[in-house]
A protein has these predicted regions:
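Residue-level detector of extended alpha-helical repeat arrays and alpha-solenoid scaffolds
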Residues: 50-51, 81, 114, 145
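N-terminal alpha-helical scaffold/docking segments in eukaryotic complex subunits
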Residues: 1-64, 179-195
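Core register positions within helices of long alpha-helical scaffolds
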Residues: 57, 87, 120, 151-154, ...
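Short inter-helical turns and helix N-cap capping residues of alpha-solenoid HEAT/ARM repeat scaffolds
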Residues: 46-47, 76-77, 109-110, 140-141
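Conserved hydrophobic register position within alpha-solenoid helical repeats
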Residues: 53-54, 84, 117, 148
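Eukaryotic acidic, Ser/Thr-rich intrinsically disordered low-complexity regions
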Residues: 145-195
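Amphipathic alpha-helical scaffolding segments comprising HEAT/armadillo-like alpha-solenoid repeats
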Residues: 26-41, 60-74, 93-107, 126-138, ...
């Protein structure tokens, strides 16, 4: 953690989470919550097969998000944190927990986790993410800088596809996260049912 605290962009990040960052809440019964927390402890490994098996035991869809947000700061393996942030992307527009996980990911020590976290914030299209993204525009590594640039561009123009195609391919790239994101998809008006 010492290296991270010395980075200038980490120091410039806001120290408090937005007011909407209430403690994660879950509708699951107490015994089920305990089981999910134990599964997430096993999830914290570099072994992809073990993570995949643990992932199958988590509740599908939105009910898992409060637990991912709760476990994220204590998760040691970069691979596990990347998986957590990746899964939250699908719910960035409909879940406060997914958005908050994106904000937490922006402070991560791994550039790959920060890249995925910028993707959550870009897909959410929420302007209150901009104060968390702007310091990353001056990050030392190119991956974080480009991800933050794409996310800021996507939010400013309210077009999540600009996150991936914010340079030479502007207007030619579509980032399809859920059904309805692709203008050429026949069922473009319906959202995917991930719950």
């Amino acid at each position: 953690m010492g290296w991270l605290r010395r980075q200038w962009w980490y120091v410039t990040l806001p120290r408090t989470q937005p007011a909407a960052a209430d403690p994660p809440a879950s509708e699951l019964p107490e015994d089920e919550q305990l089981r999910v927390r134990n599964v997430l402890r096993r999830f914290d490994t570099a072994d992809a097969a073990v993570r995949e098996e643990a992932w199958k035991e988590l509740p599908p869809g939105r009910p898992a998000l409060p637990f991912l947000r709760e476990a994220f700061p204590e998760t040691k393996r970069m691979e596990a944190r990347i998986s957590m942030v990746y899964e939250a992307t699908f719910f960035a527009r409909v879940s406060e927990d997914a958005f908050q996980l994106g904000l937490l990911g922006c402070r991560d020590r791994s550039k790959h986790v920060r890249d995925r976290a910028c993707g959550i914030l870009a897909y959410s299209l929420r302007k209150d993410a901009l104060p968390f993204l702007r310091p990353l525009l001056r990050a030392d590594d190119e991956v974080t800088r480009e991800a933050a640039e794409g996310a800021v561009d996507a939010i400013k123009h309210q077009n999540h596809s600009l996150y991936w195609g914010h340079d030479a391919l502007r207007g030619q790239t579509f980032w399809v996260v859920n059904r309805g994101d692709d203008p050429w998809f026949p069922d473009a008006g319906r959202d995917i049912d991930r719950e």
